[in-house]
Amino acid sequence: NVSPNIFFEDTSSEENIKRLPILGKIAAGIPILAQENIEGYLPYDDNDADFCLRIHGDSMINARINDGDIVFIKQQSTVENGEIAAVLVNDSATLKRVYFVDDTVQLRSENPKYKPMVFSKNNCDNFRILGKAIALYTKF
C-alpha cells in the first residue's frame, strides 16, 4: 500500500533550481542577457538551459511551438544540422531549424507558408546562432 501523499510531496532540491531570464526580444549589439531584454524569470531545474525565449508568431507550429510559448535555450554558437536554434537575424531573434546545405546556411520554419532564409557560409554577418532549443513550456 502506498500513501497518496507520495504523488504530492516535493522531492526536488532547491539548490538545483535556477531562475532563467525570459527574453521577449533580443536586439543586435546588446548582450543577450542585458536587463532591457529581460521580461521576467522562470524556474528551471535542468542545468543545461541558460535563458528562455518567448515565441511570437506561427512559424514553428508544425514543431508544436506556438505563439506565446516559451522555449528554453542552451547558449552556444553552433548547432547540428536540422536542430532548432535561437538565431539573431539582423536585429531580431527568431527560432528556426538550421540546415547546412552546400555552401549555405538555411533557416527553415516549421510552417509551409514561410520561405527559408538562406545565407552564404562565406558571408554570415547578418546572423548568428544564439543557442540550441532544449525544452518547451506551453500552456493549454
Q: What residue ranges belong to the model's regions?
A:
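Short, positionally conserved secondary-structure boundary motifs
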Residues: 1-66, 81, 92-93, 100-104, ...
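Well-ordered beta-strand positions enriched in small/hydrophobic/aromatic, beta-favoring residues
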Residues: 53, 85-87, 107
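Hydrophobic beta-strand signal
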Residues: 71-73, 86
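Short, Lys/Arg- and Gly-enriched loop/turn segments at beta-strand edges
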Residues: 78-86, 94-95
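PDZ-domain C-terminal substructure recognizer with occasional recognition of PDZ-binding tails
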Residues: 96-118
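Short proline/glycine-enriched turn/loop segments at secondary-structure junctions
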Residues: 118-125
